[in-house]
């Protein structure tokens, strides 16, 4: 099943124009779609009481690039109460480049929004001053309209950069407008800057590459063990499916090369 033939490419899904832009930009850089195992590529389920059952759909999309990207994947969820776009780029460890992390989650009463160049090394060892200035500028522009959410704990904060966009919005029309306009514009700028940085970067030596491998593994292991979406996914799709999805697709260290 192609994602283009699903609800995730229609206006019914909140994040449709985000995933369309994302896929089109990866196409521009000659990324190749990666076939996800059928067990995880599409899943239907239902939740709620017998009298008010609601359907929910999940689609997992992936891509690679021979020289620059080990694995890029998007998990898309649609239902009346939950709408999710979770996206991660795992770059090749031949290049000293952070992850690109996107986590846009609409819950029954709020939206949780995360967008960042997520470091796999200490920030000072992975971001030069020019890149830091650029992402901080994008962050400030976005947060001139979107409120900044609560401070993260130290064990979580180390996996985010100074350019982190992190917001929590109540569900109402004003939030819809912010998502459709300010967040979408920031998302496009972030993605374009990330891909430009990744595809213009130079290869690193063996010693630094080993540090990057270790750093990527640390991040993926932490996310696998502490994924905040685990309870929600388990309640919607079952524990067995959720654990397999998290371990084999979303945060598998087999993707680190």
From Swiss-Prot:
Keywords: Oxidoreductase. One of its GO terms (molecular function) is phycoerythrobilin:ferredoxin oxidoreductase activity. The keyword Cell division does not apply. Its EC number is 1.3.7.3. It is an enzyme of class 1 (oxidoreductase). Belongs to the HY2 family. HAMAP family: PebB. This is Phycoerythrobilin:ferredoxin oxidoreductase. The gene is pebB.
């Amino acid at each position: 099943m192609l994602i283009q033939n699903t609800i995730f490419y229609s206006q019914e899904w909140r994040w449709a124009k985000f995933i369309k832009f994302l896929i089109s930009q990866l196409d521009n850089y000659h990324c190749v779609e990666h076939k996800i195992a059928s067990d995880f590529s599409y899943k239907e389920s239902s939740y709620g009481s017998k009298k008010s059952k609601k359907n929910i759909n999940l689609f997992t999309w992936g891509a690679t690039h021979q020289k620059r990207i080990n694995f890029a994947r998007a998990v898309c969820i649609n239902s009346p109460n939950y709408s999710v776009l979770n996206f991660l780029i795992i770059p090749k460890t031949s290049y000293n480049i952070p992850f690109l992390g996107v986590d846009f989650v609409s819950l029954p009463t709020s939206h949780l929004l995360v967008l960042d160049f997520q470091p796999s090394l200490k920030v000072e060892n992975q971001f030069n001053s020019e890149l830091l200035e650029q992402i901080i500028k994008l962050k400030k522009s976005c947060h001139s309209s979107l409120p900044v959410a609560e401070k993260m704990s130290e064990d979580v904060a180390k996996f985010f950069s100074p350019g982190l966009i992190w917001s929590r919005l109540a569900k109402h029309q004003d939030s819809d407008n912010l998502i459709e306009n300010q967040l979408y514009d920031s998302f496009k700028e972030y993605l374009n800057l990330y891909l430009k940085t990744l595809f213009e970067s130079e290869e690193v030596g063996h010693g630094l590459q080993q540090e990057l491998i270790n750093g990527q593994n640390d991040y993926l292991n932490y996310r696998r063990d502490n994924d905040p979406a685990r309870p929600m996914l388990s309640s919607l799709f079952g524990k067995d499916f959720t654990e397999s999805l998290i371990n084999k697709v979303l945060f598998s260290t087999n993707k680190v090369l």
